[in-house]
């Protein structure tokens, strides 16, 4: 029986933990990134999002750029991040200027790569991640062992 580790957030820590501790494969061995691997989430929002089958995850009515109110999860107070208002998720890895990722990852669209054209590339990226999540859940229904990995924020 194969083992599939799926991160349920709260930041990228669970995905890293899963890869470093053999709970899931790494990309080089075929792992497909899932929606909660590289973002700042919260467990109630994750549960609601899964119950909604990701219906509002990339919905235009719930996406905006928001200033982070505090330092947490590798983000800096005042940093402007893509935010889902329904689930209270921050998409920090695709936000303008976060950690200089647009430079280090060579985003072809520059600093606004994921927010231009009404978040078109953000939606494309996360739709792929949602499909990977669904595929892994289906594999679990077909006999693979699924291990959900979740961290929580401690104030």
What are these language model-derived features?
Residues 1-155:
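Extracellular glycan-modifying ectodomains
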């Amino acid at each position: 029986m194969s083992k599939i580790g799926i991160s349920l957030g709260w930041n990228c820590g669970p995905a890293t933990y899963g890869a470093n501790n053999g709970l899931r494969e790494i990309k080089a061995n075929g792992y497909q990134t899932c929606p909660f691997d590289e973002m700042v989430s919260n467990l109630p929002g994750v549960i609601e999002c899964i119950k909604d089958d990701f219906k509002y995850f990339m919905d235009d009515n719930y996406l905006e750029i928001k200033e982070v109110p505090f330092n947490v999860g590798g983000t800096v107070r005042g940093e402007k991040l893509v935010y889902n208002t329904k689930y209270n998720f921050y998409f920090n890895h695709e936000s303008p200027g976060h950690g200089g990722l647009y430079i280090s990852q060579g985003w072809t669209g520059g600093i606004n790569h994921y927010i231009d054209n009404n978040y078109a590339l953000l939606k494309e990226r996360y739709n792929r991640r949602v499909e990977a999540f669904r595929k892994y859940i289906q594999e679990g229904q077909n006999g693979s062992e699924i291990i959900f990995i979740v961290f929580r924020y401690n104030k």
